[in-house]
A protein has these predicted regions:
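Auxiliary, metal-adjacent structural segments of Zn-dependent hydrolase domains
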Residues: 6-61
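Post-HEXXH active-site segment of zinc metalloproteases
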Residues: 75-79, 91-122
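Short pre-active-site segment immediately N-terminal to the catalytic Zn-binding motif
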Residues: 64-81
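Short amphipathic alpha-helical segments
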Residues: 1, 61-65
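Short active-site segment of divalent metal-dependent hydrolases/proteases
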Residues: 82-90
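A structural signal for well-ordered alpha-helical scaffolds and beta->alpha junctions
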Residues: 13-24, 82, 113-117, 121
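Surface-exposed helix-capping loop/turn segments at secondary-structure junctions
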Residues: 2, 29-36, 94-97, 131-139
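Long, well-structured alpha-helical subdomains associated
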Residues: 124-152
C-alpha cells in the first residue's frame, strides 16, 4: 500500500496516525478502492471555533483527504477519515467525474451529490464501526489470554 499520512498541525497525532494506518487497509479492502489516497491532518483555529465548522473534505483532483483536527475526539476524526475514503472510492469508480466545484448546500440542492453523501455517511460509518468492533474483540481476546497466563 502506498498511502501517506501527513500531519500539518502542531498537535502530536502519533496515536491517531497509528489508528489510521491500521484502519486504512481494512477500509481499502471493504470499500474496494483501487488507488491509494493521501491523508492530511490540518489545523484551523478559526474553523475550530465555529460549532458548525468544517470537519473534512475530499479533493478528487489529487486523491487527497483533508481532516481538521483541532478540538476533536480521535474517534470522531476516524469517522471523518472513513467518510472521506468513501468519497475516494466513489472517485476511483468514476462517480465524481464531471461534477464541477461544490458549493455550500450542494448536498441539499443536487440529487446526485445527495446520493453520494448518503452513501458516504452510511458506508463510512458502517465500515468504521465494523473495524472498531473487530479491533475491540481482538483486544478483549488478548486481555483474556494475558489474565489466563497470569493465573498460571
Amino acid at each position: 500500500m502506498n498511502f501517506n499520512i501527513k500531519n500539518n498541525s502542531s498537535h502530536d497525532l502519533s496515536q491517531l496516525t497509528n489508528l489510521v494506518r491500521e484502519f486504512y487497509p481494512y477500509a481499502k479492502k471493504h470499500m474496494g478502492f483501487n488507488r491509494d489516497a493521501n491523508i492530511f491532518f490540518e489545523s484551523d483555529l478559526q474553523n475550530a471555533k465555529n460549532p458548525l465548522g468544517k470537519t473534512a473534505y475530499y479533493n478528487p483532483e489529487d486523491f487527497s483527504v483533508t481532516i481538521y483536527v483541532d478540538g476533536r475526539h480521535p474517534k470522531d476524526i476516524m469517522r471523518s477519515v472513513s467518510h472521506e475514503l468513501v468519497h475516494h472510492h466513489q472517485n476511483c469508480d468514476g462517480k465524481l467525474d464531471n461534477i464541477g466545484p461544490t458549493h455550500e448546500g450542494y448536498a441539499q440542492s443536487d440529487t446526485y451529490l445527495r446520493e453520494m453523501e448518503e452513501d458516504a455517511y452510511k458506508r463510512g460509518n458502517l465500515v468504521f464501526r465494523d473495524w472498531e468492533n473487530q479491533k475491540n474483540i481482538k483486544e478483549i481476546r488478548k486481555m483474556k489470554v494475558t489474565k489466563e497466563e497470569l493465573k498460571n
